[in-house]
From Swiss-Prot:
SUPFAM superfamilies: PE/PPE dimer-like. Residues 433-442 have a biased composition (Low complexity). Transmembrane segments: none annotated. Residues 443-455 have a biased composition (Basic residues). Residues 179-203, 433-459 are annotated as: Disordered. Belongs to the mycobacterial PPE family. GO terms for biological process: response to host immune response. GO terms for cellular component: extracellular region. It comes from Mycobacterium tuberculosis (strain CDC 1551 / Oshkosh). Residues 182-192 have a biased composition (Acidic residues). This is Uncharacterized PPE family protein PPE20. InterPro entries: PPE-PPW_C, PPE_dom, PPE_sf.
Length: 539
């Protein structure tokens, strides 16, 4: 009897009883049940009086009899509900009395604390065993309080459980119908226990786990949810009586129903396998579609819930199918992308240096004759390159943007301070010198291209490609002359070098005298003429 409670010390039981909710909530509930019983009794008396008036004065014949017969079940339910409320209030008072008695019998916290303090003092002053007998008496008192607390809790638990089981459960009110002919006839037989054997049956006998869950539901809901696994009812109604999924109790009824279905299927599987699969077929074909139809009807009444559910389902399906579709991308042949390969000129045919449109490269010729400047038409034609450019022509970008040979005169210029003699001004001599210089320059470029090709070149076009007018003959082309206003032989196109001015180039050395013969300082273009008029007359 005291098995669950004897394992705990009396301090635990005393704290649970003295520091709990007390009898206040139970007294309020008992009072409300008494008031509810009085209201049910008053309603029953009103209905009974109304039925008496209808039967005696208001109506006559079969209509009056049908009216009275239709309301008689409801009148009986009102009377029974009033009696149930009275019985429930009485059982609650029994629990209140049991609680009060348990509090009186339970050792208080003060008594338990005093016993422990006394024991500590006796043990501390137990010199030569003089307190042995008082210590034994004190421990015996504590054991007695331990047993008394366990017995008190066991008695209180037994009385409370018996009162709880004796409390009646009020069934829902019956329907007010004219006769039993309006009730649906399912054509299914039931035994005296009320279990349906022709179709989907619930209940039969309660298992230990069913009773455990029933107690949990009752405790969590404070008695508002009563599950009867024996009869297969929830709050007095069969599972199938809950047809509206908008109520939370519908989902609870479905969960309990399928839980008991699983238990019944497991039992039949070991005792009657054929009946087990017939039962499973009925659940899948009849019971489950019925509940699905109820959910569909409920969602149809609330389109926003249906749209939200469909949106979530479609989103998840779209994600799954999208990931599955990625696996098929490897089988799709990719579109052929044409590789852009620049058309390169053979290394042997390319010049060793790039030219800039409008700037003519200087070529060292015999006698230090300056190279002739390109014609304006040639400078304009360098920007219109054809689809298949020839091997010679002007480049498309300045050569100083890339590394390599440069425009022809590097940092280590080999020109000395002693200038050569000026070229003849006659047109015939210049034409002959230019032709010879071009021939030698082409030979030198071919040799240098074969020896070392930089590899940073562009396509070249011919000067006369894409133009209506033919390029001028070499003998009529003006020669390129270095100007004092330019950067040496690669000066501005169309300028003429001033013959009277000595060109500044590189470092100069002094005569080998007492002051030395080494380089002193670079020659700066201090002898250039900065007068704009002088510059214009030589253009």
């Amino acid at each position: 009897m005291t098995e669950p409670w004897i394992a705990f010390p009396p301090e635990v039981h005393s704290a649970m009883l003295n520091y709990g909710a007390g009898v206040g909530p139970m007294l309020i509930s008992a009072t409300q049940n008494g008031e509810l019983s009085a209201q049910y009794a008053e309603a029953a008396s009103e209905v009974e009086e109304l039925l008496g008036v209808v039967a005696s004065e208001g109506w006559q014949g079969q209509a009056a009899e049908a009216f009275v017969a239709a309301y008689m079940p409801f009148l009986a339910w009102l009377i029974q509900a009033s009696a149930d409320c009275v019985e429930m209030a009485a059982q609650q008072h029994v629990v209140i009395e049991a609680y009060t008695a348990a509090v009186e019998l339970m050792p208080t916290q003060v008594e338990l604390a005093a016993n422990q303090i006394k024991l500590a003092v006796l043990v501390a002053t137990n010199f030569f065993g003089i307190n042995t007998i008082p210590i034994a008496i004190n421990e015996a008192e504590y054991v007695e309080m331990w047993v008394r607390a366990a017995t008190t809790m066991a008695t209180y638990s037994t009385v409370s459980r018996s009162a709880l089981s004796a409390m009646p459960h009020t069934s829902p009110p019956p329907l007010i119908l004219k006769s039993d002919e309006l009730l649906p006839d399912t054509g299914e037989d039931s035994d005296e226990d009320g279990h349906n054997h022709g179709g989907h049956s619930h209940g039969g006998h309660a298992r230990m786990i069913d009773n455990f869950f029933a107690e949990i539901l009752r405790g969590v809901s404070a008695g508002r949810i009563v599950w009867d696994p024996v009869n297969g009812t929830l709050n007095g109604l069969d599972y199938d009586d809950y047809v509206y999924p908008g109520h939370a109790i519908w989902w609870l009824a479905r969960g309990l129903e399928f839980f008991q279905d699983g238990e019944q299927f497991g039992e039949l599987l070991f005792t009657n396998p054929t009946g087990a699969f017939q039962f499973l077929l009925y659940v899948v074909v009849v019971d489950l579609p019925t509940h699905i139809a109820q959910i569909a009807t409920w969602l149809g009444q609330y389109p926003q819930l249906l749209s939200a559910a469909l949106t979530g389902v479609i989103a998840h399906l779209g994600a799954i199918t999208g990931l599955a579709g990625l696996s098929g991308l490897s089988a799709i042949p990719s579109a052929a992308i044409p590789a852009v390969v620049p058309e390169l000129t053979p290394v042997a045919a390319a010049p060793p240096m790039l030219a800039v449109a409008g700037v003519g490269p200087a070529v060292a010729a015999p006698g230090m004759l300056p190279a002739s400047a390109p014609a304006p038409a040639a400078a304009a034609g360098a920007t219109a390159a054809g689809p298949t450019p020839p091997a010679t022509g002007f480049g498309g970008f300045p050569p100083y943007l890339v590394g390599g040979g440069g425009p022809g005169i590097g940092f280590g210029s080999g020109q000395s301070a002693h200038a050569k003699a000026a070229a003849s001004d006659s047109a015939a001599a210049e034409s002959a010198a230019q032709a010879s210089a071009r021939a030698q320059a082409r030979a030198a470029r071919r040799g240098r291209s074969a020896a070392k090709a930089r590899g940073h070149r562009d396509e070249f076009v011919t000067m006369d490609m894409g133009f209506d007018a033919a390029a001028p003959a070499p003998e009529h082309q003006p020669g390129a002359r270095a100007s004092d206003c330019g950067a040496g032989p690669i000066g501005f196109a169309g300028t003429v070098r001033k013959e009277a001015v000595v060109k500044a180039a590189g470092l100069t050395t002094l005569a080998g005298d007492d002051f030395g013969g080494g380089p002193t300082m670079p020659m700066m273009p201090g002898t250039w003429t900065h007068d704009q008029g002088v510059f214009d007359e030589h253009r």
